[in-house]
């Protein structure tokens, strides 16, 4: 085994071990008064049942959960006794563990080298996933409305594509507005960051704030927003003052769309957006391909029937294009690459897909609130551990083998090893390192990302140098 890989994984093992040992969990349980005196059900037992062993805390029967706990620890509980342990203090305990792991910034050392990092220190991707919860929780977690969405939980996540670090995170009611959380995330911005936002987070004020702070953005523009260019020959009053309504000329976006061929791009380099307060920006218009347009129309039909929304005729006509706004310099990200860069946002959808398809975070029976929340935070701890491990392995496999790791495949394989990782944590960091080395060998053999014909991967877009089918691939930003 390469000593540098072993050394890297040893440091990573120490980070994992620090906040998950039985002694740490027991001390935390007493500190948070989840456990007041020595009793048969400990904080460590709660972590076992919610994080390490059971994948179905919210859907398996209490009898089954008791059986799983007894099989691993020998702790004998009645179903009624276990149900009582799913209380507010148990939720607080698991939530505290998750928050501690987030603050620990385990992924800060998992940075991948790329040409994009020359320009953008962090590529911040923000999105949310939502799922329904039992209807009797509608007063605590009101849903987003629409078909059968009386109660729901929304999980907001912003993470850095370069390192995998979770930057901002929030569990909230399904009805909460995405834009509000997007504005809250401004507090953690640093000069040199690149924020990629979808329409749900669109805010002209937020984009203006980013620009003022030396932060770059790529965002979709809502179709009801106006785009202007400066009028070179404005009208004046007799006293020499410019008539405000003549300072700018409205751009006919539909006309531009109709002049473009499918897949073609057009840029307005010196544009202004906003009706009253105008923001100077680049505007890029991308005409959708026939396939993309069919998919969008299909989605519109689904949205109209599912959420009771009716699109105007103008919106349906303009559905044939994407309009992007960005303050990135033209020489860093040419207009031909804006659509590719914006597509990086879909990486967060892969993460959310693992949450539901692999971890079943959205799977529940008609249970009480505290048990559901224990399920959610237990899953989030497991998800964070698997994601952090995946991003570390992604970095090492690129660094040592020049290969691109599939995030989805890797998280599934790491999840399969979660229980033996738990067993290693009960011992020492050397044992954790041994398991991580096993995982490294497995992932480099079976975890390579599949490439579709003429489809760029994340590494291609970011300008990462890696090997694929015997060739070295390198895509540069400019």
Swiss-Prot record:
Keyword field: DNA recombination, DNA-binding, Transposable element, Transposition
TM region(s), chain numbering: none
Role description: Involved in the transposition of the insertion sequence.
A Pfam family it matches: DDE_Tnp_1
Species this chain originates from: Bacillus thuringiensis subsp. finitimus
Keyword DNA-binding attributed: yes
MF annotations from Gene Ontology: DNA binding; transposase activity
A Gene Ontology biological process term: DNA transposition
Domain of life: Bacteria
Family to which this protein belongs: Belongs to the transposase 11 family.
Record protein name field: Transposase for insertion sequence element IS231E
């Amino acid at each position: 085994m390469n000593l540098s890989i072993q050394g890297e994984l040893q440091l990573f093992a120490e980070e994992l071990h620090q906040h998950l040992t039985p002694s740490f969990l027991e001390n935390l349980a007493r500190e948070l008064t989840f456990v007041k005196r020595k009793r048969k059900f400990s904080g460590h037992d709660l972590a076992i049942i919610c994080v390490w062993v059971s994948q179905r805390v919210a859907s398996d029967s209490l009898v089954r959960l008791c059986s799983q706990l007894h099989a691993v620890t020998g702790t004998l509980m009645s179903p009624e006794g276990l149900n009582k342990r799913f209380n507010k203090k148990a939720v607080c305990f698991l939530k505290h563990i998750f928050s501690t792991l987030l603050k620990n910034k385990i992924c800060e050392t998992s940075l991948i080298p790329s040409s994009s990092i020359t320009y953008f220190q962090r590529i911040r991707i923000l999105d949310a996933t939502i799922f329904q919860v039992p209807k009797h929780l509608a007063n605590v977690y009101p849903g987003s409305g629409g078909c059968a969405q009386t109660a729901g939980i929304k999980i907001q996540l912003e993470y850095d594509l370069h390192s995998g670090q979770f930057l901002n995170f929030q569990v909230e009611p399904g009805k909460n507005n995405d834009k509000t959380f997007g504005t809250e995330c401004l507090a953690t911005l640093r000069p040199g960051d690149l924020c990629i936002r979808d329409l749900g987070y669109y805010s002209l004020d937020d984009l203006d704030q980013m620009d003022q702070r030396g932060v770059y953005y790529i965002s979709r523009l809502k179709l009801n927003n106006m785009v202007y260019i400066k009028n070179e020959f404005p009208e004046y009053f007799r006293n020499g003052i410019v008539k405000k309504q003549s300072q700018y000329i409205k751009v006919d976006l539909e006309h531009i769309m109709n002049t473009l061929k499918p897949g073609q791009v057009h840029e307005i380099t010196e544009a202004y957006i906003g009706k009253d307060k105008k923001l100077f920006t680049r505007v890029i218009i991308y005409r959708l391909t026939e396939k993309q347009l069919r998919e969008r129309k299909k989605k519109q039909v689904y949205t109209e029937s599912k959420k009771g929304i009716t699109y105007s005729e103008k919106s349906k006509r303009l559905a044939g294009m994407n309009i992007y706004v960005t303050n990135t310099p033209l020489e860093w990200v040419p207009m031909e690459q804006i659509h590719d860069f914006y597509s990086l946002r879909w990486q967060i959808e892969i993460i959310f897909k693992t949450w539901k398809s692999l971890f079943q975070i959205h799977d529940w029976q008609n249970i009480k609130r505290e048990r559901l929340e224990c399920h959610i935070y237990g899953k989030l701890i497991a998800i964070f551990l698997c994601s952090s491990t995946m991003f570390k392995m992604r970095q090492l496999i690129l660094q040592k083998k020049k290969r691109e790791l599939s995030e989805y495949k890797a998280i599934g394989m790491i999840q399969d090893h979660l229980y033996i990782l738990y067993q290693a944590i009960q011992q020492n960091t050397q044992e954790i390192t041994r398991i991580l080395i096993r995982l490294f060998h497995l992932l480099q053999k079976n975890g390579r990302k599949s490439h579709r014909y003429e489809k760029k991967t994340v590494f291609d877009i970011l300008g990462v140098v890696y090997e694929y089918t015997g060739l070295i691939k390198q895509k540069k930003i400019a």
